[in-house]
């Protein structure tokens, strides 16, 4: 079936009785993912987690015990120093790291692959905060984002194709290859081994798990390179 079995939005999670008065952040997604897997133990299973990540106000993206970097920016009035703003942002990244570790731990004994990427970066310099600057003037911090592919040992060993894909990803990591969101569609399907009889449906040049992958960005700018 191409229809989702279920979906939840943040407001629905917040309204649940067991969450009354509780902080609702990205970590709350993990139990829902675990529950979904338990309810569908056999067959192919796709779970999409839409996180808040490190969106402003950064101090609202992590609990107090993750405030490792101080002083932290706690207000939205624009009066925070650059150092405090960066500290709050770093704390939010630290919390996301812990969420990803928890996510991976839930999947280590399964044949699983995880794709993670941010939709944009954030500017933290004076008078140039946040994102959505027009592309022609956007600083690198706004368009250079993390892109992660994680595979469990069971997934890698499931077949030679997965092993080859993993080696290709490690190769690109070692080369510090410049990748972009343009690769997400073909990479997700390609790493999963999806094939299509339609020639134009999948582009191996955009598939990070393929040896045919080619970068679409220069290393120093956000200028796209469109091959003929």
Positions of the model-derived regions?
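Short glycine/proline- and charge-enriched loop/turn segments
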Residues: 8-17, 67, 128-134, 163-170
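A long, amphipathic alpha-helix that forms part
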Residues: 31-35, 72-117, 143, 148-150, ...
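A short beta-strand-to-alpha-helix junction
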Residues: 83-96, 135-145, 156-188, 198-203
